[in-house]
Swiss-Prot record:
Monomer. May form homodimers; homodimerization may enhance autophosphoylation and enzymatic activity. Heterodimer with TLK1. Interacts with YWHAZ; association with 14-3-3 proteins such as YWHAZ regulates subcellular location. May also interact with FEZ1/LZTS1 and FEZ2. Interacts with CHD7 and CHD8. Interacts with DYNLL1/LC8. This is Serine/threonine-protein kinase tousled-like 2. The keyword Aminoacyl-tRNA synthetase does not apply. Changing R339W: In MRD57; uncertain significance. Its cofactor is Mg(2+). Belongs to the protein kinase superfamily. Ser/Thr protein kinase family. The gene is TLK2. It comes from the Eukaryota. Residues 462-741 form the Protein kinase domain.
Amino acid sequence: MMEELHSLDPRRQELLEARFTGVGVSKGPLNSESSNQSLCSVGSLSDKEVETPEKKQNDQRNRKRKAEPYETSQGKGTPRGHKISDYFEFAGGSAPGTSPGRSVPPVARSSPQHSLSNPLPRRVEQPLYGLDGSAAKEATEEQSALPTLMSVMLAKPRLDTEQLAQRGAGLCFTFVSAQQNSPSSTGSGNTEHSCSSQKQISIQHRQTQSDLTIEKISALENSKNSDLEKKEGRIDDLLRANCDLRRQIDEQQKMLEKYKERLNRCVTMSKKLLIEKSKQEKMACRDKSMQDRLRLGHFTTVRHGASFTEQWTDGYAFQNLIKQQERINSQREEIERQRKMLAKRKPPAMGQAPPATNEQKQRKSKTNGAENETPSSGNTELKDTAPALGAHSLLRLTLAEYHEQEEIFKLRLGHLKKEEAEIQAELERLERVRNLHIRELKRIHNEDNSQFKDHPTLNDRYLLLHLLGRGGFSEVYKAFDLTEQRYVAVKIHQLNKNWRDEKKENYHKHACREYRIHKELDHPRIVKLYDYFSLDTDSFCTVLEYCEGNDLDFYLKQHKLMSEKEARSIIMQIVNALKYLNEIKPPIIHYDLKPGNILLVNGTACGEIKITDFGLSKIMDDDSYNSVDGMELTSQGAGTYWYLPPECFVVGKEPPKISNKVDVWSVGVIFYQCLYGRKPFGHNQSQQDILQENTILKATEVQFPPKPVVTPEAKAFIRRCLAYRKEDRIDVQQLACDPYLLPHIRKSVSTSSPAGAAIASTSGASNNSSSN
């Protein structure tokens, strides 16, 4: 840039230097039309050729120059070079000159022959008349700041021409405003109108020009520098904090990886220990099963023609009990025979002749025949006299001896009866143990034939331990959830590979429906469903809550029945769960309530219960359910017939209508079975027989056996549940409010006045006596 400036023509250098160092005042008349010209045109750097003073006509060059306003009478001021107005003619007027607002005080100029090697020309100090101290000082500072423009241009040669022009124009604006405020600007024949125009221009320039001074700029620069230092310090602090956080994150990541590795090792060790424990339990179960095979019995394969069937053979425990029963029976027969003989020797009462027995009559007939015949030898005489001696010995038994012998025989019979009862109780206990043994044998057989017997981990989460049971198309395994660290029950649904795709789809749809119903349920008396996932195209799994105990059906098979308090507690919990199922939206009918679907948490009848198996549940949505008639039974024939009401067996053109009263009937049947140890309808019948003989359709009234003794309130409750017509049967809401199931009402009755308590006790005693 500097090389380009030095290579310019000296006249152009003078022109460029004059643009930034000197501003002339027009000698021509005031032209109002040129007052709207921008002052920035003074510093414009157009490349267009301009008319210089050398190119002007001679008449203009020979004209005598008027004295400048700042020249005194004694002489002229410091000589100046050509004015900037001599080099430019404005488009606003025909004659050369400037507007009145462009008059500024003259400053020292460099001669046209001044070289650019001296960029800072000498500045002539001129007094500023008519200004106060601050204004004069400000004008002096503004005049002193003018030569800095060339120094900036030379110090920063890379600035473009437009930026230099803008800076020069800004300095010109400052000088114009200062000159307009001075009294010298009002001379040379200017009118008041021109002064007002100058004031307006000055105000306009003050509005667009910054008022910042060097001190303010320095202060701003210092503040900006301090702010910049603060920002840089803050940035450094943030960078250090970021580095610290990154270091902490790296440490946490390493620690997390370490903990993950440790957790994986713990999970691996847990799996190893669980598998080892499961194997030990399996071995113990198989050893016990082998021992029970000899004691309780086992299955043997028997051939019948071309087929083989399994036949049960009792063990030595049953054989010993059977032998003891045979011994007791033989002893009882012997005692009965001796009692008959003792009855023959019973002495007659006082004053009565002993009645002739059959033996005496036979002997008398024999003696009469012997008298007619002659004796042949002495042996015949002994034979004839022996019965006579026996008859005399029978007559010699006294009454005391007879009663003594009779008492002995009674005691012996009582002892045998007691032994027989003990043997019968032991036999029943062995039968229950045998049922468990048979169940365990089947479980072991199914487990050995299962494809999941080697402790696989399903879905990378559930470790299978051992088989709990097997149904028609599913297997239930006890498993361990490695993620939640809890035991669960995994139900594996396996479809038959020979099924058609349509049947598989229906089964899968049915299972998904059960999953959707069960997944939304959350009640303490309902088994929770945790998860659902697929294994392959023919199998999928549902993960359920695990309960240690057995179901109610197993308990009833072991104990036959239970007390009324225990049965009532179970029924209260079942009704509580049914109430929840009917309060949710949409309500749900379980439809398959039975002892096998009621789990005892701790295996006893005095604990908590949970309801499971929602495979046949019915959703009572608005589309299919009517509050008056109920909903159509689309799955007629499904379910357990002993626990279904009569309306489920009605056959007609349209499907039967059902409601939540189906579950109420099931509650009544379960309560009856818990109290009496048998089902109220079709106890010893199969489901096929119940269907063929219409057993449930004929169950118009329930009958109660005399034993065991049950309270009338319990019987009335069962009758309300087992009403034949569904219109007469109570629903679930009424069942939950039944007086028999409300403890506070029963307590209030029992804790009433003493007279009332006495009346209640006497009425209860009379009811018990009548029921007996």
